[in-house]
Amino acid sequence: MQVVVLAGGLSPERDVSLRSGRRIAKALRAATDFEVIESDVDATLLARLRAQTPDCVIPVLHGAAGEDGALRDVLQSLNIPFVGSIAAACRLAFDKPVAKTLLSNAGVNTPAAVALPHSTFRELGASEVLAAVLDSVGLPLIVKPTKGGSALGAALVHEAAQFPAAMVGSFAYSDVALMESWVQGVEVAVSVLETPTGPKALPLAEVVPLSEIYDYTARYTAGTTEFFVPARLSADVAQGCADVALTAHKVLGLRDWSRTDLIVDAAGTPWFLEVNVAPGMTETSLFPQSLAAAELSLGEITAQLVRTAIERG
């Protein structure tokens, strides 16, 4: 059986994607006799896929093309089975304001937020728009691109003077910025895995960064973040977090695996932040840590998802 692991691409998260792809490929080789091919994504990809005719593809691309559904649309058009969510579900999950709205409509708590394109600030005047957002959302707030991951372009704003620079940083990664109320509490990631009996939440991962927010450096530099898996939460609160992640997985129509990021406030209430259709698989990533806490093998689980994808066709 030939399996192609797609990683890399041109997004700002290229390096993380390559690290995730290498780890998945290594785990698959150790757990199976599959022929595992690691492949970057460039203008030669489609020709290579047609020549290789793989039995299955595992997209491990982060950011645009990998998580916005575009590549998966192409794989579907080529009738190549792949692990992960279909394109339509990816588009819903990748757009943070859309995902927040859908989850809010499903009864899930999500912080108050405003999403505005760069053009609005030019047309209406940056100072007036920023003042209106502050009145609506309040401080502190976090600014982040509406599309993208790894906390690239994210900044925490404690006072109005920090707001303009935070917006500039966000617009460097996306034309639309999300300005979201900052909920203080415990940061938790809930990984969801599809099983023969349905989606299951894995042991929760609690994230304690040395920096103020769980930014790119804190995510991918060893020693900059402390992890607790399972999270140091009561059974009831942990179940509440798992329920939110399972709701996100279902409402957005996700498939195979996902990871939902939450904040648990002082009252034990989980607040939905975002969901990832291509969870990171690096040495410091949360999905593999939750798998390990459940005494599950990354290679064996991925192999099972490959077999399921092939059966789906």
Residue map of PLM features:
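Active-site nucleotide/adenylate-binding loops and adjacent lid/helix of ATP-dependent enzymes
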Residues: M1-A7, L49, L92-G185
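ATP-binding N-terminal substructure of ATP-dependent carboxylate-amine bond-forming enzymes
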Residues: M1-T101, N105, P117-A132, T308-G313
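Hydrophobic beta-strand scaffold residues
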Residues: V36, P81-F82, T110, L141, ...
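Short, flexible, mixed-charge acidic loops at enzyme active sites
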Residues: A70-S77, Y214-T221, V277
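Short beta-strand-to-turn element immediately C-terminal to the catalytic PLP-Schiff-base lysine
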Residues: L116, A154-E159, V192-T195, D265, ...
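Phosphate-binding site of ATP-dependent enzymes
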Residues: H158-D243, T269-W271
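ATP-dependent carboxylate activation and anion-phosphoryl transfer catalytic cores
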Residues: S234-G313
